[in-house]
Each structure stands twice: as structure tokens, then as C-alpha cells.
């Protein structure tokens, strides 16, 4: 089943596109919750970890929904993930009345998470191709 999920004509691609759109909307919603409404956490840099995971999942889903596993697709997913993270942060800066602010550290967390999502996809696709 794993190797079927990574083929070009996979029936999972359409579902992955839907999940990618839903996940992107979830990122937008979570990133624009007013600052005072956010729960407190004792975990150091908890918000950075949240950004990291959100964008790792986003780029992984993007790759699952994508047309191929070529290097150009991997790079496109990475650029889209980084650009999406940057856009979210820019919008947070513009909408500072929500109690949110633009953070370069969040952009770094988004970008590193995006890279991890692409890497995880590549490793799983490579393993699936090896066992096929």
C-alpha cells in the first residue's frame, strides 16, 4: 500500500490535495488566533515547535498531492512551504491588533519544518520504490 501512495497515478493524490487545502486553512486559523486567547505553555519555545510541525505536515501533504517526486517538485514544495510561512508572518505583522506579531524565528521554524516535511516524503517514497 505504501508504494501505491507514492505513484504518479495514485488515487490518494486527490485526497491528499483536499487534506493539503484543509491543513493550509488550519494553519491560517491557528496563526491568527488573538494572542491573549492562546494557551500558556511550560515547554520552551512551544510556539516554534508548533510552527515546525504545522509546516512539516503541510509540505509532506503538498508532496503527496504533487505530480511527481522529481527534484523540481521537492524544491517547489520547499519554496511553497517557506513562502507560505513568510506570508503568514507578514500578515501577522499587518494585523498586530490581534495581539500577534511578525517573528523571524517563526519564519525559521516554518522553513525548517518545510524542509523536514520534504525530507520525510523523499525518504518514504525512496523506501516504497525500493520495495516495489
PLM region spans:
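Bulky hydrophobic segments
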Residues: 1-104, 111, 115-132
Amino acid at each position: 500500500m505504501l508504494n501505491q501512495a507514492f505513484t504518479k497515478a495514485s488515487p490518494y493524490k486527490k485526497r491528499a490535495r483536499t487534506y493539503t487545502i484543509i491543513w493550509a486553512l488550519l494553519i491560517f486559523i491557528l496563526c491568527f488566533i488573538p494572542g491573549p486567547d492562546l494557551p500558556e505553555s511550560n515547554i520552551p519555545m512551544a510556539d516554534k515547535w508548533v510552527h515546525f510541525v504545522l509546516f512539516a505536515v503541510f509540505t509532506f501533504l503538498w508532496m503527496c498531492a504533487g505530480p511527481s517526486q522529481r527534484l523540481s517538485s521537492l524544491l517547489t514544495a520547499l519554496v511553497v512551504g517557506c513562502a507560505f510561512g513568510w506570508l503568514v508572518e507578514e500578515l501577522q505583522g499587518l494585523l498586530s491588533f490581534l495581539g500577534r506579531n511578525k517573528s523571524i524565528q517563526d519564519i525559521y521554524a516554518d522553513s525548517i519544518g518545510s524542509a523536514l516535511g520534504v525530507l520525510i516524503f523523499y525518504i518514504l517514497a525512496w523506501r516504497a520504490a525500493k520495495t516495489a
